[in-house]
Amino acid sequence: MERKTKDEKNLKKAKKLDSKTNRKYSSRGQMKRRIKNSKTISNVKEIGDDGLIYLKSGEVATLIEVKAIDLSLTSNHEKNLFFSMLKALYQVPNLNLKCYKLNEKLNLNANKDNLDKKIERFQNDEGKKILLEESRNLIDDLEEKNFTVSSKYFWVLIAKDTAVLNKQLDEIEDITLNIVPRIYIESVTNKLEIYKFLSNLYLTSNSLDELVWSDLPSLVSPMNMSERTDRIKFDDKEFQILTVKNVPPFVSELFFEDIFNYPDVRASIGIQECITQEELIRWVNSQYQFLLTDRNTTKKLSDATELDTQKENFQALMQDIKNGDEKIKEVSLILIVEGDKKHRDEVIRDLKRIADSYQIKLDVPRLRQMEAWQSYDISTKTFEDYCFYLPTLTLSAGFPFTKTYFNDSNGYMFGVDIHTSLPIFFDPFVLNNSRTSHNMAIISSTGGGKSYTMKKMIVNEYGRGTKIFIFDAENEYKKIVEANKGEYIDLYSKTGGIINPLQIRFIPSDDENHDTKETDCPLAKHLGFLEAFFKTAFESITEKELVMLLAIVEKLYNKKGIYKNTSINTLQNMKPEEFPIFSELYEFLPEYKKDVDSKEKEKIIEQLDILLSRFLTGTDSYLFDGHTNIDLSNDLIAFNLQELLYSGNQRLINTQTLNLLTYLNNSIVANKINNDKVKLEDRKHVMIIADEFHLFIDENNFEVLRNFGQLARRIRKYSGSLVVATQSVKDFVGSQSILRHSTAIFNNCQYQMIGMLKEDDLLAYLELFKQNPLTDTQKNFLMSARRGEFLLNIDSKNRLRIWIRATELEREMMGEGETR
């Protein structure tokens, strides 16, 4: 009752709106012609207020939208299980089902709106504005060239009356609910949506406003119609209808997929039960006799082997039919090919080539085009001579609703879906029930396109306002930083940047119920960082020395006016020069020593004097003994760590990496505090990128990996993302200790992008990601992937094969082309 009221209100609203506007509708003569043509073209009588479709032939039908399932990446076991469970749907008693694939442009309006808002937001930032405008224009260009036309799938269930219809619909809903992977269906009862479907089905050019306002299904029919020998013309649209003449009873899985989903071709599969059990057995016997004749006359061993397999299949089929486990269905496939003659000929030739590979015979029925159309229509009418019989298991194995589409409306075009050739718009900062963090792991063997992919991501994230920090292990990112006027900071030279380890860190909270606020007091957590830092800097420091050193550091902080109750808000207002440095700490030792009350403590302080003197000379001095002098205000900052990582000094590598990693927490926390003060759409994201991540492994000290693991856990709550990338995944499974710490990081990566992998790299990947295994199909893809081709794991149920593509402007901003 509520649905009826809602539809009535929508209809009245549309009529009221149209009465106030100057729209041109069909004249009375045009309407008469449409109504006359509809008697031949459409079997639809009316759309009921209950959302059902009432047919001229007396039956009633309901429209069901079906979400696609990409079976191309599932394992053989998963596919066979799916086909076996789907068989029950086709065995619903007295089933009359039409399966439709219609072409529909992807709705990218939300993508455009989001880009328009960003263009307005960055109106005064020329670099970002140019990239955003190109991204916006790219969508228009893709739409204009029909690169955004996707498949939309529907079932139309037809029954003799509403009681039978509702019973069958309940059965179908139960079956689809329990199939693995699940088929998501939705009954379409809204009149506007039903008219949209009919308009698409019948190739109409009438406006939806006119159809809804008139409430006449006959208006979806053309005004002028003519049938030729091998084609039909509706108004100014000429098209040809193809149908299947023959399908083998046992054929390769997904045999309908490529034919049914051919771009810009409408398709219909009709499924009905119209032969008795006795006729079934007679039909199987006749097919079996034909097979035996072929087997007795063949002389080729390969043919004989294939025929023997078919013979066994027929025997099993006969037994299943007798046991009631299998049924045979009458099936028809209709294809509508539009365009000029040259285009139609090319499409038909290509469709026949695809069909031949499955031993399926496609035909253009001559002098029977209108009869073929009526079989395509919503009806139970069979197309004599062009129907074929299939066991329900074979029919299930031909499941055609497989072309999925992925779109994050707030994302950027990341690449092209290899399976569907559609653009993929990706936003790593989506947050929902199945996407619970923003972290990503990018893994491929050498030459797989890992760095190119990361640069593509960096440019687009920077363009939409994300603050990006890059751990540059190979001096690969200097060009991209310079091309976008970022900051490139050397952290291993006398003239490079200094990060003072004694400047207070704002360590994010691990508590899910507590977000860091500007009123929090960070000194206690900062001392925890210094404990790890000192253990790494002084490999031989004892527990007593460490406890004493931390007590001295805290006393020095107190002398500077920093206490355990000093808030982040206060610390943010302090200048770097107001924090102590190691020379001051060293000079403070004698003062602290005066107040100790035991000889043992005096000896410990004397030992600390020796340890801390390390920070006063040599490399430690110019890396750590000084006030922080780097500026993190730029949105694109790369830290050059190449010389550090290849220095061979693992102690310095670990201490400086820890120093940098924890210092970035200040930016992460400050960004969170600022985000809490602004509107949702104005919030800023932070992305930390660590390329060549395997170079940060130290088998004797896991403090760096442990801190990366903590960051991976915490950063989600702070609008942040950690991206780790490697071309040497084997290094992460070198020992159980390394594997344990590495798994803590990689298991916190929502997204995995896996590119071309050599066999040993693939084995290492499978070991590292045991909780998220790959199917044989996915493994084969990775073993044969080309440069730039990746398997993108969105969540446990959503995996895409993506080909990374970049525009000329993007390549320029990536430092891969000439500067503007």
Which residue stretches match the model-derived regions?
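Extended, folded cores of ATP/NTP-driven motor/assembly subunits in large transport
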Residues: 2-399
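P-loop NTPase motor domains
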Residues: 51-54, 64-69, 76-94, 100-105, ...
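P-loop NTPase motor core of the ASCE superfamily
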Residues: 142-146, 173-174, 181, 440, ...
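The Walker A (P-loop) glycine that initiates the GxxxxGKT/S ATP-binding motif of P-loop NTPases
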Residues: 443-444
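Walker A (P-loop) phosphate-binding loop of P-loop NTPases
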Residues: 447
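Conserved lysine of the Walker
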Residues: 450
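Hydrophobic positions on the alpha1 helix immediately C-terminal to the Walker A/P-loop
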Residues: 453
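Conserved H-loop
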Residues: 473, 691, 717-720, 725-734, ...
